[in-house]
């Protein structure tokens, strides 16, 4: 098979105007692969280290020239001559070169950029689309798009503590139909907000970020938009949350809706929401190191709703193994840049699926036009993808790639729909 001939990197801008790393890998047969690395706003404390320059005179300290140089001067020369299809060997060579537990020497942004670009180059050399190259002949499941249409928390400046309110078109027959439903609800929500005199400004991920009095007010607005768009809440379109609770956890308590709450009180609050709204999924309902609290909420609500670990697991197989062992959460959020390599991402997904955990592929709030995660979602048949509102090119690029994949798969394409959420029983 073709071997790695050249590795180059550059500093580009992400969707928030911050620098990030883009890598191109060239093989000796002329095949090339390119990948750009995303970056998060609410980052888990246990994520792999993203290398930033810290020079206040360039990009306010957020430059990534160090990571770019790490690719050009250290990683590239090390990988020349490697068989591009040996993904695990290549990733391991980079881990060995970095020689830290958290990729803090070369930077997870440098390592991931190379890791993904190698996969793209190898798929081109194999004359296969990336989803087929990584997933083999069984990759055929199109994910439910979990569209973040209302923003609060650290993605917006408002009184809403919950970071993301998502819609999940579970009743659609195909991915393309699901995307249409989502876009129609999104536009209807804009009209609803305008009618009520609320702001239609957008958050980082394309969702609206009005200043609302409560989290329930946000859910009520979305239910209203679903109905006005002509769909049935819970039957055709369900709801999902990303609470990002670590963002409002202070001194052992959750500062939520103007009150200081314990994990038990937060769990009671979620129980009320689950009984009142057609929720299929709650992500990061508690602090990222509150393992005992996570077990309690999973025991109480895990048979009714998907409890997703994002900051809890940070796509790390070791932390995920602990969650499986202790019964904390029942689903994994998959973010390639949290762990910093394709191999470890695939290992985490495999571990989750082997143990009955669902997986949701995810973007970051700082994205680019890179569409790798769309292919990855289909490659691992995870059945769910979270990549923002059906607006802004950095988000829509992923949805459009999934439309193309659905077209390539043709009759073999299967839309996950309701089957992605087996714990969700019925509409409210």
Swiss-Prot record:
GO cellular component: cell surface; extracellular region; phosphopyruvate hydratase complex
Enzyme class label: lyase
Enzyme Commission code: 4.2.1.11
Active-site residue list: 205, 335
Subcellular location: Cytoplasm; Secreted; Cell surface
Note accompanying the cofactor annotation: Binds a second Mg(2+) ion via substrate during catalysis.
Positions of Mg(2+) binding: 242, 283, 310
PROSITE patterns: ENOLASE
Pfam family, one: Enolase_N
Cofactor(s) listed in the protein's UniProt record: Mg(2+)
Pathway membership, UniProt: Carbohydrate degradation; glycolysis; pyruvate from D-glyceraldehyde 3-phosphate: step 4/5
Domain of life: Bacteria
Positions with a binding annotation for (2R)-2-phosphoglycerate: 163, 335, 364-365, 386
Any one Gene Ontology molecular-function term assigned to this protein's record: phosphopyruvate hydratase activity
Principal subcellular localisation of the protein: cytoplasm
Reaction(s) this enzyme catalyzes, per UniProt: (2R)-2-phosphoglycerate = phosphoenolpyruvate + H2O
GO biological process, alphabetically ordered: glycolytic process
Keywords from the UniProt entry: Cytoplasm, Glycolysis, Lyase, Magnesium, Metal-binding, Secreted
Stated family: Belongs to the enolase family.
Functional description taken from the UniProt entry: Catalyzes the reversible conversion of 2-phosphoglycerate (2-PG) into phosphoenolpyruvate (PEP). It is essential for the degradation of carbohydrates via glycolysis.
Record-given protein name: Enolase
Gene from which the chain derives: eno
């Amino acid at each position: 098979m073709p071997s790695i001939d050249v590795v180059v990197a550059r500093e580009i801008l992400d969707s928030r105007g911050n620098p990030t790393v883009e890598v191109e890998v060239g093989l000796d047969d002329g095949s090339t692969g390119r990948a750009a690395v995303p970056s998060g706003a609410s980052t888990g404390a246990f994520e792999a280290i993203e290398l930033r320059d810290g020079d206040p005179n360039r990009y306010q300290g957020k430059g990534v020239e160090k990571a770019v140089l790490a690719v050009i001067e250290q990683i590239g020369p090390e990988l020349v001559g490697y068989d591009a299809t040996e993904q695990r060997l290549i990733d391991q060579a980079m881990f060995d070169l970095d020689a830290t537990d958290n990729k803090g020497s070369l930077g997870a942004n440098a390592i991931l950029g190379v890791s993904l670009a190698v996969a793209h180059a190898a798929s081109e050399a194999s004359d296969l689309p990336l989803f087929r190259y990584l997933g083999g002949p069984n990759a055929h499941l199109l994910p439910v798009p979990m569209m973040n249409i209302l923003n609060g928390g650290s993605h917006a400046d408002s009184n809403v503590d919950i970071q993301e309110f998502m819609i999940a078109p579970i009743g659609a027959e195909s991915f393309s139909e699901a995307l249409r439903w989502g876009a129609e609800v999104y536009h209807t929500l804009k009209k609803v907000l305008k009618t009520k005199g609320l702001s239609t400004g957008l958050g980082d991920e394309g969702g609206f970020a009005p200043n609302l009095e409560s989290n329930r007010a946000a859910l009520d607005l979305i239910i209203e938009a679903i109905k006005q768009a002509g769909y049935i809440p819970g039957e055709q379109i369900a709801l999902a949350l990303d609470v990002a609770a670590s963002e409002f956890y202070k001194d052992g308590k959750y500062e939520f809706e103007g009150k200081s709450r314990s994990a038990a009180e937060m769990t009671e609050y979620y129980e009320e929401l689950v009984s009142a709204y057609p929720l299929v999924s709650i992500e990061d309902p508690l602090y990222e190191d509150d393992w005992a609290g996570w077990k309690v909420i999973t025991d109480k609500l895990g048979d009714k709703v998907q409890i997703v670990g994002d900051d809890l697991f940070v796509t790390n197989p070791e932390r995920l193994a602990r969650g499986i062992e202790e019964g904390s959460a029942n689903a994994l959020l998959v973010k390639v840049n949290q762990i910093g390599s394709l191999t470890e991402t695939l290992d985490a997904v495999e571990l989750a699926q082997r143990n009955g955990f669902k997986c949701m592929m995810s973007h970051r709030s700082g994205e680019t036009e890179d569409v790798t995660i769309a292919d990855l979602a289909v490659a691992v048949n995870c059945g769910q993808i979270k990549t923002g509102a059906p607006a802004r090119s950095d988000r829509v690029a992923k949805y459009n790639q999934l439309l193309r994949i659905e077209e390539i798969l043709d009759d073999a394409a299967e839309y996950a729909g309701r089957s992605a959420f087996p714990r969700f029983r019925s509409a409210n």
